[in-house]
Amino acid sequence: MEREIMARLAKWKDSPDRKPLLITGVRQCGKTYVIKEFGNRYFEDVAYFYFEGNKGLASIFDYDLEPERIIKELGSIVRGKEITPGKTLVIFDEIQACPKAITSLKYFYENLRELHIVCAGSLLGVSVKRDNVSFPVGKVNRMQMYPMTFPEFLCANGEQELYKGAGRFEPGKELPELYYVPLRKYLKYYYLKLRT
């Protein structure tokens, strides 16, 4: 399934000014899927860490916020496999569940810039205010992710040609039935999926 945000992620990966990336968006909009897919496509290895309900994982950030130590412990103790900057994509999922992990992003930016780190969070703004988290302003890149768009939905259902074909017609003009009928069917299905 191809999402439009994937191209932005690839651009972030190759940016000389890259900072740890924080992707926010509502629950169930596909953040985790997209980030894992991005890692599998563009990196030799993916190190995935899920913070929600995992106090042991969060405790790694209690001692200090030194990136080298954190990455070594995440790799050797939690994961059982070394994390290699430049080759491994590190994913912190539901990062809002570990306020110190959010704060640590500042130090990852300052002291371990060669590491590619992507974080995902839902209701992150609420969590930051509620828990009085020291947010690393200016030390992270941010992207907002939204639920799947109708064009993405068409492509995910194997209808790339229908999407391209309909796109050749001028907006506001009546579509030929050849396009209108299937597009209408998919639009109904799309709206039903959005509600579930």
Model-derived features: positions:
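Sensor-1/coupling segment of RecA-like P-loop NTPase cores
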Residues: 110-132
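Hydrophobic anchor at the beta1->P-loop junction of P-loop NTPases
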Residues: 23
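Short glycine-rich substrate-engagement loop in P-loop NTPases that contacts/grips substrate
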Residues: 53-86
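Hydrophobic positions on the alpha1 helix immediately C-terminal to the Walker A/P-loop
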Residues: 34, 38
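Interdomain motor-coupling "hinge/lid" segment immediately C-terminal to the ATP-binding subdomain
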Residues: 128-196
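Structural recognition of the conserved hydrophobic beta-strand(s) that form the central parallel beta-sheet
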Residues: 91, 116-122, 144, 153
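Conserved lysine of the Walker
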Residues: 31
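Pre-Walker A adenine-sensing motif
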Residues: 1-16
